Amino acid sequence: LERGMGILDDEIKKIDKVLPGEVAFKLYDTYGFPLDLTEDILKNKSLGLDHDKFHKLMKDSKELAKKNWKGSGDSSVDEIWFGIKDKIGSTEFLGYESNQAEGVILSLIKNNKQSENLKEGDEGMMILNQTPFYAESGGQVGDLGTISNGKNIFKVSDIQKKLGNLFVHYGSLKTGSIKVGDAVELKIDIERRANLKAYHSATHLLHESLRRTLGKHVMQKGSLVAPDRLRFDFSHMKPITNEELETIDKLVNDYVKNNTEVTTRIMTPKAAIEKGALAFFGEKYGEEVRVVSMGKEKEAYFSTELCGGTHVKNTGDIGKFKTVSQSSIAAGVRRVEALRD
């Protein structure tokens, strides 16, 4: 909400009487900024809003989401997400800065239907206004942890994103009962997150080390960032020699020993790519992207990629790195697996 408020303040300075519907839609769809809050702020400043444009963009967005939605194969479950997204909008992700947060339960799902409550022993899904839990994406698995209200404890076993930025917490209620509207405390498994951050940052260093050792034709084709290992798929036509593997490991470990800062910036995709950031998979990016860099800017970053994952603050937090296997998974695509101490 803080970022959305800043954007709204900047846009208000540019207008005379009416805020463009495109701005209100971006605030709602990208930052989870409620429309009624935008309206209240505008009203207090005697300003209006282009509601027609906002609602047209909402309609177009819903139609596009339904067109592109692959779903689970269960139409009754899939339809739920559209109804929830229409009602509550996007979930605000706090996990880049926080390991825990307070939130409000906006929706509960039990037995593939929306429910007003969960009782002890129930398995279900929970959606809140905000969360520090990272949802599985970009190869990085989701966080685990707990969501609680006093002695009422919901154990999170998985977290996925639906329809863009709707964070769905899967799990079971271990004790007590909870209901829609409850204020709760969200806590991720900090040790597990620390391992995920280290492996994700190691993946970036591995990617750049592969490119520097094998050639610039190396491009990421897939990855798995788990709390106990990493797997990296990339374009390359032949097996990596033992000498090349030693060089790759040395490059990664040298950068770990340098303990250089890991920085993140928010930029437009065009500006990021002009700065040398790598983008992958032919992905479609929004108006703003998160750029993760390792190294010193004045000396040219060692690694710069577009990435929405979580990362260490300094490369020294990664620990010793070692590739443990390589294999061919398709024509022209190889896989490397690695561990860290």
Regions flagged by a language model, labelled:
Residues 1-341:
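A glycine- and charged-residue-rich anion-binding loop/surface
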